[in-house]
């Protein structure tokens, strides 16, 4: 796997870690002890929503976000793979 730097901008401050391109960002964050919101873990709700500030993610597995949300940079971290070094604002459920 290729590893990318993921920086999460959370209400508790910045969290940065290396994430392989074949592990969902939410799963990887949890493994290293970063507590992020989630509910279904299936890409079909908005509990884990975040917004990409820079970089690229593959969020094509999600079934909740519409094209407008995705065009605006919103992702579901439970079903998002890093495709580059990426910065994501977390806790965006209210916005989607």
UniProtKB/Swiss-Prot annotation:
It is found in: Plastid, Chloroplast. Binds 1 [2Fe-2S] cluster. One of its GO terms (molecular function) is electron transfer activity. Keywords: 2Fe-2S, Chloroplast, Electron transport, Iron, Iron-sulfur, Metal-binding, Plastid, Transport. The lineage of its organism: Eukaryota, Viridiplantae, Streptophyta, Embryophyta, Tracheophyta. It comes from Panax ginseng. GO terms for biological process: electron transport chain; ferredoxin metabolic process. This is Ferredoxin. Its cofactor is [2Fe-2S] cluster. CDD domains: fer2. The keyword Magnesium does not apply.
């Amino acid at each position: 796997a290729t590893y990318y730097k993921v920086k999460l901008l959370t209400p508790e401050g910045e969290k940065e870690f290396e994430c392989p391109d074949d592990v969902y960002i939410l799963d990887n964050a949890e493994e290293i002890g970063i507590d992020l919101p989630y509910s279904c873990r299936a890409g079909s709700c908005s509990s884990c929503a975040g917004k990409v500030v820079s970089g690229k993610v593959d969020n094509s597995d999600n079934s909740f976000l519409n094209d407008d949300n995705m065009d605006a940079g919103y992702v579901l971290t439970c079903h998002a793979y890093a495709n580059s070094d990426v910065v994501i604002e977390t806790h965006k459920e209210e916005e989607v």
